[in-house]
């Protein structure tokens, strides 16, 4: 009985791992930010709960498809070789059915508790990541994460539209921030894992153009990100608190990118990658704090 329970528990964990829960949580933080930034009043509990649940389920479904398509690549890379599909703990067909179930349930929740526009935008994001990026761009071009990054940048727009019911300039600006953040975030990881990507024949920028070229582009995109992150203040979407935070966080990111560009230390790339995660989290927290501070003035 104990053995059977341990197998079932492991299988449950395997399916949870397929959804990339840590990535989904970061996406939902930006979705939540989009929801609260969209209104000067409170967000209804049904939209808050079921809207984010629907977005999260669809994101999880897209992640499962990514695992299925990349299972052979994952088996070749040290970072991913222990994933459930790469090790054969979960078969492709059950995984695809699981992905379909997640996506369908997520779409139903969005259609029932938010609005049709949110549901269709979420579906477009899902297909962009699971089909366009995973199925084609990842293996086709070193600009894969630049083009495919748009799908991953959608959550704040989805959260905003779930509350407002329409698309406006402000949520598109939030999308632009994540879009500019994506290349330095992923290219830093790609430098750290360059040999693994080369072994798996994935044309990441460090593999096709070299580390020096990639580091320069990380630096350039970080400069673009710093400029873009100041736009919410420029259009009076946010106030001085956000401006100070965006400058401090952005300049620190720029320092990481500069150190990476100038340094040959092996840990500089992974340090930049890790900072980029905290950067995005802190930037959206700053947006929220500033938003509600302005409302109370």
From Swiss-Prot:
Segments forming a coiled coil: none
GO molecular function: protoheme IX farnesyltransferase activity
UniProt topology in membrane: Multi-pass membrane protein
Main location: membrane
TM spans (from-to): 23-43, 45-65, 93-113, 117-137, 145-165, 171-191, 216-236, 241-261, 277-297
Pathway: Porphyrin-containing compound metabolism; heme O biosynthesis; heme O from protoheme: step 1/1
Record Pfam families: UbiA
Keywords: Cell inner membrane, Cell membrane, Heme biosynthesis, Membrane, Transferase, Transmembrane, Transmembrane helix
Subcellular location field: Cell inner membrane
GO cellular component, one term: plasma membrane
Source species, domain of life: Bacteria
UniProt xrefs under PROSITE patterns: UBIA
Entry's Gene Ontology BP terms: heme O biosynthetic process
Reaction catalysis annotation: heme b + (2E,6E)-farnesyl diphosphate + H2O = Fe(II)-heme o + diphosphate
Documented EC number(s): 2.5.1.141
UniProt KW Ribonucleoprotein keyword: no
Entry similarity comment: Belongs to the UbiA prenyltransferase family. Protoheme IX farnesyltransferase subfamily.
PANTHER family per record: 4-HYDROXYBENZOATE SOLANESYLTRANSFERASE, PROTOHEME IX FARNESYLTRANSFERASE, MITOCHONDRIAL
Function of the molecule: Converts heme B (protoheme IX) to heme O by substitution of the vinyl group on carbon 2 of heme B porphyrin ring with a hydroxyethyl farnesyl side group.
HAMAP family with a match to the protein in the record: CyoE_CtaB (MF_00154)
General remark: Carbon 2 of the heme B porphyrin ring is defined according to the Fischer nomenclature.
Name this protein carries in UniProt: Protoheme IX farnesyltransferase 1
Gene (name only): cyoE1
